[in-house]
């Protein structure tokens, strides 16, 4: 038995030696530097990760290596803290360091990186220059005040909600399909010519206007709880859902949005509502406004209508299949 243990130790030692000889020493040193930083609990980060030998990268929990290069790092929810420098990890494909207390992370020049999740940290800075393969970025619930997508030509999904942005510009992000910027401090949001953008969630901000020029693929739009008093939406043929409640909105124009099915514009100051060209409306909630007339006639797809707490004298739902069990007036 003793001989077996000795042989096993020799094998493991040899494997560790071979890995050390093969590994990228720059990457190892950068990770070692982070592992030795103080964690959120006051001890070292490597202790939080259950790493017993900081000099043996082959045994580091959460890190996957291939040909001596780090290709994946999964260190989520480990009470880690400090600054993580992954600059130049050109084989790295996936990083998940969410639910920690990191203050800075650098993934610039990670040219193979396709997925990055650094949400629920204390990040005030996120360096993501030259990450051409990045498709999905989650950085919500941090302390970011600025974010540039110029080095992310392939980005499709971005969730940067609950940060400290005052303005955000993603103009011309050709591949972007989903953008969530809810719960920030946005006063300005630019999404011009994002021709593949399908989902835009920008509620709970301080926007006074929103230009959707060129967003021809937009399907879901949520601008709840902003400060947009007047809004005109036109020629958005793919738009199926519009939520714009709690804006103190005085005018809302919806023209030629032929796919629109759900319209929620409650808790505003609307005195009229004429969603022209929206023959596919299925659900409308325009409650808590100042409407005196409402004409939704010939909406043959309409199933639910909530229009309570208005000043309605005339309500026209003729030639609509809406049942009175789904009508609140």
Q: For the regions a protein language model found, what residue spans apply to each?
A:
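N-terminal capping/linker segments that flank leucine-rich repeat
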Residues: 4-12, 16-94, 111, 174
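Conserved small/polar residues in nucleotide/adenosyl-binding loops
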Residues: 325-329
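Right-handed parallel beta-helix
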Residues: 94-121, 129, 138-140
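Leucine-rich repeat
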Residues: 89-91, 110-112, 131-133, 152-154, ...
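Canonical leucine-rich repeat
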Residues: 83-84, 105, 126, 147, ...
């Amino acid at each position: 038995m003793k001989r077996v243990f000795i042989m096993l130790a020799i094998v493991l030692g040899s494997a560790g030696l071979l890995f050390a000889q093969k590994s990228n020493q720059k990457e190892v040193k950068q990770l070692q530097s982070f592992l030795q930083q103080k964690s959120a609990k006051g001890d070292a980060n490597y202790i939080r990760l259950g790493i017993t030998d900081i000099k043996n990268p082959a045994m580091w929990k959460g890190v996957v290596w291939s040909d001596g290069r780090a290709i994946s790092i999964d260190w989520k929810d480990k009470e880690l803290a400090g600054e993580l420098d992954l600059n130049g990890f050109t084989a790295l494909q996936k990083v998940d360091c969410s639910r920690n207390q990191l203050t800075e992370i650098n993934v610039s020049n990670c040219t193979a990186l396709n997925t990055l999740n650094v949400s629920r940290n204390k990040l005030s800075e996120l360096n993501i220059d030259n990450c051409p393969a990045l498709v999905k970025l989650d950085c919500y619930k941090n302390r970011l005040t600025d974010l540039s997508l110029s080095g992310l030509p392939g980005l499709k999904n971005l969730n940067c909600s609950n940060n400290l942005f005052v303005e955000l510009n993603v103009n011309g992000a050709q591949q972007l399909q989903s953008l969530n910027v809810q719960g920030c401090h946005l006063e300005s949001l630019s999404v011009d010519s994002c021709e593949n953008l399908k989902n835009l969630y920008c509620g709970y901000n301080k926007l006074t206007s929103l230009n959707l020029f060129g967003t021809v693929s937009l399907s879901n739009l949520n601008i709840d709880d902003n400060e947009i008093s007047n809004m005109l939406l036109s020629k958005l043929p793919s738009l199926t859902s519009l939520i714009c409640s709690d804006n103190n909105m005085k005018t809302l124009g919806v023209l030629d949005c032929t796919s629109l099915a759900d319209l929620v514009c409650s808790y505003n100051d609307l005195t009229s509502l004429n969603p022209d060209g929206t023959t596919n409306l299925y659900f409308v909630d325009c409650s808590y406004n100042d409407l005196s007339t409402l004409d939704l006639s010939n909406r043959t797809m309409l199933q639910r209508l909530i229009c309570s707490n208005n000043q309605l004298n005339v309500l026209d739902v003729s030639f609509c299949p809406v049942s009175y069990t789904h009508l609140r007036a």
